[in-house]
């Protein structure tokens, strides 16, 4: 995948953490994963990409970070709804990032959708 495309998602992810939650994100080095590679994160926001490039973009978070994002969001929910709201919040967060990233890389035709 093109570095411009990867960097657009990385930059917009960092911007979204700051603007939505006041969290300054410090990313590790972006990398490509092989199909079936395991990971250590409990919650994932996934996007399918087609067009000039094909693949999946994954925003993976530890549950403790998703819980902090949920706390900072100001959403009201019952204890029984907590996990559902955390997953929903990460999904919406991923959608915000994808919308901004696609705008930032308008020179490429990319169609983005949940896998």
Can you annotate each of these PLM segments?
Residues 1-115:
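N-terminal auxiliary interaction/assembly segments of multi-subunit proteins
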């Amino acid at each position: 995948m093109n570095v411009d495309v990867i960097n657009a998602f990385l930059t917009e992810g960092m911007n979204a953490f700051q603007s939505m939650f006041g969290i300054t994100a410090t990313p590790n080095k972006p990398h490509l994963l092989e199909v079936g590679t395991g990971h250590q994160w409990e919650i994932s926001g996934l996007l399918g990409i087609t067009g000039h490039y094909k693949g999946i973009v994954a925003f993976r978070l530890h549950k403790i970070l998703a819980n902090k994002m949920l706390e900072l969001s100001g959403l009201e929910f019952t204890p029984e709804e907590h996990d559902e709201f955390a997953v929903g919040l990460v999904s919406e967060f991923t959608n915000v990032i994808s919308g901004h990233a696609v705008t930032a890389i308008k020179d490429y035709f990319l169609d983005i959708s949940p896998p």
